[in-house]
Swiss-Prot record:
This is Ribosomal RNA large subunit methyltransferase H. Its main location: cytoplasm. It is an enzyme of class 2 (transferase). NCBIfam families: PRK00103.2-3 (NF000989), PRK00103.2-5 (NF000991). It comes from Rhodopseudomonas palustris (strain BisB5). Specifically methylates the pseudouridine at position 1915 (m3Psi1915) in 23S rRNA. The gene is rlmH.
Length: 160
């Protein structure tokens, strides 16, 4: 199963990008041993539409173009479900074991995600009630993906 992160906005050079790349690399190394076929990141430019509805619609169209048929869609949204790391790992493991071709994680723009896109998701995740900068959400997601791989591998990184 291939994992993909689709994010509205680009990470500029700096500590957030370095940390994101570190977790991505760690996952790639361990994930291949667990039957995952890598982790892709697609950055989509923020819409320049005048209103929030227009921006969300343009961004949703760009996101939809990257969603492969048969993939499990996971959206990140403040209204989503908060799951612990073990449950997150178990879900990724189930999708892998069910031969789902891919799991696609979507991080929306400043206005959030179009409700229709959120409804299509098999899972809508939240990293709590706080509002997080998009750069941090990407780093936190990549860390959780890496942590999930360590849990599935029985690696001591996760000590819960």
């Amino acid at each position: 199963m291939r994992l993909t992160v689709i994010a509205i906005g680009k990470l500029k050079q700096g500590p957030e990008r370095e940390l994101a790349e570190r977790y991505r690399g760690r996952f790639d190394d361990l994930g291949r041993k667990l039957g995952f076929r890598g982790l892709d990141i697609h950055e989509i430019a923020e819409s320049r539409a005048r209103d929030a509805a227009g921006r969300m619609a343009e961004e949703a169209a760009a996101i939809a173009a990257l969603i492969a048929e048969g993939s499990s869609l996971v959206t990140l949204d403040e209204r989503g479900k908060s799951v612990d790391s073990a449950a997150f790992a178990a879900q990724l493991g189930r999708w892998r074991d069910e031969s789902v071709p891919g799991t696609i994680f979507v991080i929306g723009g400043a206005d959030g995600l179009l409700p229709e896109l959120r409804r299509k998701a098999k899972l809508c995740l939240s990293f709590g009630a706080a509002t997080w900068p998009h750069q941090m959400v990407r780093v936190m997601l990549l860390e959780q993906i890496y942590r999930a791989a360590t849990i599935l591998a029985g690696h001591p990184y996760h000590r819960a």
